Swiss-Prot record:
Pathway in which the depicted protein is active: Pyrimidine metabolism; UMP biosynthesis via de novo pathway; (S)-dihydroorotate from bicarbonate: step 2/3
HAMAP family from the UniProt entry: Asp_carb_tr
Entry binding sites for L-aspartate: 94, 180, 235
Biological classification of the source: Bacteria, Pseudomonadati, Pseudomonadota, Gammaproteobacteria, Lysobacterales
Species this chain originates from: Stenotrophomonas maltophilia (strain K279a)
EC number in record: 2.1.3.2
Stated name of the protein: Aspartate carbamoyltransferase catalytic subunit
Function (record text): Catalyzes the condensation of carbamoyl phosphate and aspartate to form carbamoyl aspartate and inorganic phosphate, the committed step in the de novo pyrimidine nucleotide biosynthesis pathway.
């Protein structure tokens, strides 16, 4: 897939996954996003119109609030016209394929597509169908990938702990098995050379494939917290209870919920991240989510800068 998203000259053509993305490319995107964030580019009265005259479509086949809004703001701040595609009211309900939808929008002059889809590999398939000069960005597909979330998580981690990841200990907590965010963050952390990756959750929610290769894996949250520099808490999807993978929300919180008492076991000033939406009282308590070690809202803010950097790189 990497060859598909990078052209023969080494230029990023699409952003489909962070798996296999060269470290240099990853760092360039993070550096540019950091510049945008630090300069507060994109605020009212300080717009960079590098995409003026370009059209970007958010093509979402799954619900989204943060990701869609963040991409829309990013594109608008770069001067692009933004078309929001709603699958529930589109011709896809009449049987039109996603590829035909893409081609019709291309014919209208849309150059960039931000796509979210419930199926693994769906965005890559659309990239295969796209014409020359069209760029696709994966805004989350199935369980496999969510590259801009991974980028904003890494940007937030750099902001919290500095650019050198080699001595950092990071723990990812929760439903790793069904999480595209966890898979994406694992690829990014490995590429950036993080010192130690720990993964913690109920055995029923941990993958049994190569996903966790090289990680320290365990189901004892209190033990896995010792000395960590950052915690990436994952959303517990309520359907996992219906599938019998989690006995109850109360029991999950008792074993894997982050409280101030538990956070005290982590390293000094450990950063708490969460991709959202947060189930308060399940993954984290109110005190942690709103506390001084929470970087959750800074993740959201960094998301706009990251998506501006990606759009600028692909379409600018």
């Amino acid at each position: 897939m990497t060859a598909q998203q990078i052209d023969a000259s080494g230029r990023l053509r699409h952003l489909l996954t962070l798996e296999g993305l060269p470290r240099e490319t990853l760092l360039q995107l993070l550096d540019r996003a950091g510049q945008i964030r630090d300069a507060a580019v994109g605020r009212v009265g300080n717009k960079r119109q590098v995409l003026a005259g370009s059209a970007v479509c958010t093509l979402f086949f799954e619900p989204s609030t943060r990701t869609r809004s963040s991409f829309q703001l990013a594109a608008q701040r770069l001067g692009a016209d933004v078309l929001n595609f709603d699958a529930s009211t589109s011709s896809t309900r009449k049987g039109e394929t996603a590829c035909d939808t893409l081609r019709n929008l291309e014919a209208m002059g849309v150059r960039g597509f931000v796509v979210r889809h419930p199926d693994d590999g769906a965005v890559a398939a659309l990239a295969d169908a796209a014409g020359e000069g069209t760029a696709l960005i994966n805004a989350g597909d199935g369980r496999s990938s969510h590259p801009t979330q991974g980028l904003l998580d890494m940007l937030t981690l750099r902001q919290a702990k500095g650019p050198d990841f080699s001595k950092l200990k990071v723990v990812i907590v929760g439903d790793v098995k069904h999480s595209r965010v966890a898979r994406t963050d694992l690829h990014a952390l490995r590429t950036l050379g993080v010192g130690e990756i720990r993964v913690c959750g109920p055995q029923s929610l941990l993958p049994d494939d190569e996903t966790l290769k090289g990680c320290v894996v365990g189901d004892d949250f209190d033990a896995m917290l010792e000395g960590v520099d950052a915690l990436m808490m994952l959303r517990l999807q309520r359907e996992r209870m219906e599938e019998g993978l989690v006995p109850s929300l109360e029991q999950y919180h008792a074993q894997y919920g982050l409280t101030n008492e538990r956070l005290a076991r982590a390293g000094k000033d450990a950063a708490v991240l969460h991709p959202g939406p947060i189930n308060r009282g399940v993954e984290v308590t109110d005190e942690v989510a709103d506390g001084p070690q929470s970087w959750v809202l800074r993740q959201v803010a960094n998301g706009v800068a990251v998506r501006m950097a990606v759009l600028e790189t692909l379409l600018g």
